[in-house]
A protein has these predicted regions:
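Short, solvent-exposed beta-strand-terminating loops
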Residues: 343-347, 790, 803
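Intrinsic structural disorder/low-complexity segments
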Residues: 781-782, 792, 805
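Active-site-adjacent core segments of small-molecule enzymes
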Residues: 2-605, 612-620, 624, 629-648, ...
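Short linear motifs in low-complexity or flexible loops
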Residues: 798-802
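Active-site-adjacent pocket-lining segments in enzyme domains
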Residues: 575-609, 615-626, 630-782, 809
Length: 811
């Protein structure tokens, strides 16, 4: 793909050059641990700390009160060439405690020992109760200016650039859990705007398990490991989770999303993000509009398949964290468009019969198109995980003028919870003064003292009104940029503990989601429910879950029941008949391949000229080539030698988005079961390394593009991959193979990772299928090209495409 056809790569290179002024990683392969290559021997010549890697940056060097300091980031890092204690005193030894003789007792006066051990004993802070496992990056948000008619927030203005820090996370797992578990993902963004910090604290799923925050401890207690054994870790496939969600049916919609491919994303870079709740925007004249926030990834929405996710969790539990950091280091900067669905701010706060205050409901994009308002680009990795990713503190109440909350009862509870949790996790009320949390707007509050106070406040009158400090700080009005809550009218009523009747429908929207899936996506949902419920011990919970599924779709219920070996419950009340929302499907479009990882399998006898050409072409296209060989080192000699990044012992298919073979590699000398279990019990005389056959067969089974030339077809045949199967590419040259593989990568997977034949298609009455129609979904140009996966029936006309021009609701 040429640069002219790859605008994302051009943007990334421009941003890298202008924003960071950096060069890419060596040989285009990310993952270098430090900014300099270490010598074999221990360095002994004193020198100062190395600079960070070119892809890394830290928090802006503003003061605890938001004032620019002019200091460089190196000024707030460690300095000097010699080891010191915490007070700056140089040390001559840090390997031996101070003792009464070489074999004597350690002396109490050893202040260095006490300081070093005491600090180590207190290095850990309480992990987040939820979203403990996370990864983050710095970036910039550029407003399009298109939201000016409905929102006065300055950062949404045309071409306004705002620094951001984004943290992605799982929900249930502890800090050390695996990345690729089936779970909801957090997508939290901190905007350092000129008017203060704005936090958009969202998820990759647009609905939530509960409608009221008072139930949050219940759903999390149910999803977390069982309290007696502390197992299973980072899993929902256990009795307590399914006990709760089958008894508490408002969780049905979110549970269905979790069981879909959305629960096992391929990458943080390939996730949608959602604000979940309905917010209220305010324009310059005081008019209001209700909105839902969406993040739309420029790389599309893609997932792993379940077996792949499980293998990845064992082979590389840091897969998503590594993927994000490596992509940024390689210059393939992830991008998302921020968009809003807009609704009139009517007294009922409903739209097309959907209660906008219910966080378990969506508004289909066909009814309210997502209007883009800005572009997010992540262009730098953190310099220190603890100081930035671990200590960042988000809060739904961090708002700026122009953005207000609604009466969503879950959102209202979150407004309390986020501040409360930081008091324990970050050790007091001054967490906003931590460098990563510092606003870039001047702070003149009257909050004083407390644990970890780092601001040195002046004056004698931290109260209002005062005269001793000249009356400062003064109150601002709306004209001076003050945050003024919308004077929304509160309907008269009695104090009650109940939900509105509109919250009672727990099954129409889950059915809408199910009907919106293609057949292969439905197969994955069936498999997920069958797996998760199959892990439950109590049959009563499985039977109860089937009763819930029967209220979503009869076919779904019957398939899961068959997998569990249980009878499907009899049909109950008639099922809802919502119009499907094609925008909910992940299947059918093509996307840029930026940051995709391609494994090139070769050895010294392979077509090394083709390998070199392939590497260069992949790098030019914004992808990452990794050479896989029987052993490490280099292939070939001289200046043209090709560096090996992975061996048959260290590689596994889950790392690659595509695999190409540049010949028939020799069997590795370590292809013995005693050395590497992946080799199995294959005979030493076997022509092809069994670990390579495993890699290729897994890639084929997971629907990945596979290519071969120069005899590599023999390996494909030995691995059981039909040479004429969809997604299997053979050719006479590396260039010929790469062109087809790149095209396949644009669709992510062949058949969405389901190459083996599916069951016969469902009846037309069950899946709304029929001949001769077209699949549509919302895209920037309004339509999506035809997709052969699931045609619409004439009796079920797809919704009209959204308008091309942005239209805002009438106030």
């Amino acid at each position: 793909m040429s640069d002219s056809k790859n605008p994302l790569k051009a943007v990334a290179e421009k941003a890298a050059e202008a924003v960071l002024g950096r060069e890419g990683p060596e040989e285009g392969v990310p993952g270098k641990p430090a900014s300099a290559t270490p010598p074999v021997e221990e360095p002994t010549t004193p020198r100062g700390p190395l600079p960070p890697k070119p892809d890394q940056t830290g928090p802006a060097t503003v003061s605890p009160t938001g004032q620019p300091t002019g200091a460089s980031q190196s000024d707030v890092a460690q300095g000097g060439a010699y080891l010191t204690n915490a007070q700056g005193t140089r040390l001559h030894d840090t390997d031996h405690s101070l003792k009464a003789g070489p074999r004597g007792p350690v002396l109490l006066q050893d202040h260095h020992l006490r300081e070093k051990i005491t600090h180590f004993d207190h290095e850990r802070i309480p992990e987040r109760v939820v979203h403990a496992r996370g990864a983050a990056a710095h970036g910039v948000f550029r407003g399009y200016g298109s939201a000016a008619r409905i929102c006065k927030a300055a950062f949404l203005g045309k071409d306004v650039e705002t620094p951001v820090f984004v943290r992605f996370s799982t929900v249930l797992g502890s800090r050390g859990s695996a990345d690729t578990v089936r779970d909801t993902r957090g997508f939290a963004t901190k905007f350092y705007t000129s008017e203060g910090v704005f936090d958009l604290v969202g998820n990759n799923i647009p609905v939530f398990f509960i409608q009221d925050a008072i139930k949050f401890p219940d759903v999390i207690h149910a999803g977390k490991p069982h309290p007696d054994r502390e197992i299973p870790q980072a899993q929902s496939a256990h009795d307590t989770f399914w006990d709760f969600v089958t008894l508490h049916t408002e969780a049905t919609h979110h549970t269905l999303w979790n069981m879909s491919d959305r629960g096992i994303p391929r990458s943080y870079r390939m996730m949608e993000g959602f604000g979940v709740h309905t917010f209220r925007l305010v324009d310059a004249e005081g008019g209001t509009t209700l909105v839902k926030f969406h993040w739309k990834p420029k790389l599309g929405v893609h997932s792993q398949v379940w077996e792949e996710a499980q293998i990845t969790g064992g082979v590389d539990p840091d897969f998503h964290r590594r993927d994000l950091a490596d992509a940024i280091e390689a210059g393939a900067f992830p991008q998302w468009e921020l968009g809003v669905q807009t609704f009139p701010d009517n007294p009922e706060q409903t739209f097309e019969g959907i209660d906008l205050l219910d966080p378990t409901k969506i508004v289909p994009e066909e009814l309210a198109p997502v209007q883009p308002v800005g572009l997010l680009t992540l262009n730098a990795n953190p310099s220190n995980y603890f100081a930035e990713t671990e200590q960042v503190a988000f809060h739904t109440g961090h708002l700026v003028p122009g953005i207000d909350v609604t009466n969503d009862p879950l959102l209202q509870g979150r407004m309390f919870s986020y501040v409360d949790t930081q008091l324990t996790r970050l050790g007091g009320p001054n967490f906003a003064q931590l460098p990563i949390n510092r606003t870039h707007a001047p702070v003149n509050d009257m909050l004083r003292d407390g644990m970890h106070q780092t601001a040195v406040h002046r004056g004698v009158a931290p109260y209002r009104p005062n005269s001793l400090d000249g009356g400062c700080p003064f109150l601002a009005g709306a004209g001076e940029g003050a945050y003024v809550e919308v004077p929304a009218e509160v309907a008269a009523g009695r104090k009650v503990r109940e939900a509105p009747a509109s919250f009672d429908d727990h099954f129409t929207q889950p059915r809408l989601f199910w009907l919106s899936m293609t057949p292969v996506e439905r197969e994955h949902i069936v498999a997920a429910y069958t797996f998760e419920l199959g892990k439950c011990y109590e049959q009563a919970i499985k039977e109860r879950a089937l009763k819930v599924l029967a209220r979503i779709d009869t076919e779904l219920c019957e398939q899961v029941a068959t997998g569990l070996g249980l009878p499907a419950p009899a049909a109950g009340e008639p099922l809802a008949d919502p119009s499907p929302s094609p925008a909910l499907s992940q299947v059918g479009q093509t996307w840029p391949p930026d940051g995709r990882i391609v494994g090139i399998v070769a050895d010294a006898e392979a077509d090394l000229a083709g390998v070199r050409s392939l590497r260069e072409s992949l790098l030019e296209s914004g992808m990452v080539p990794l050479v896989v060989a029987p052993a490490g080192g280099k292939l070939g000699t001289g200046a043209d030698a090709v560096t090996v990044q992975r061996t048959f012992a260290t590689a596994r298919s889950v790392e690659f988005d595509a695999v190409v073979l540049a010949g028939v590699p020799a069997r590795g000398a370590d292809a013995l079961g005693a050395r590497d279990a992946k080799a199995g019990d294959a005979q030493a005389s076997a022509a092809t390394d069994p670990r390579l056959l495993l890699l290729v067969s897994e890639a084929y089974r997971h629907g990945k593009a596979i290519g071969a030339w120069n005899g590599g077809e023999q390996v494909l045949t030995a691995a059981g991959c039909p040479l004429t199967a969809p997604g299997v590419v053979t050719g006479d040259s590396a260039t010929e193979v790469l062109d087809e593989v790149t095209e396949l990568l644009g669709a992510h997977r062949v058949g969405l990772g389901c190459r083996p034949s599916l069951r016969p298609p469902l009846p037309a009455s069950a899946d709304r299928a029929g001949a001769g129609a077209t699949w549509y979904t919302h895209q920037e140009n309004g339509r999506r090209p035809p997709c052969a996966h699931w045609p619409w029936s004439a009796a079920s006309t797809p919704p009209p495409p959204p308008p091309a021009a942005i239209t805002w609701p009438t106030r």
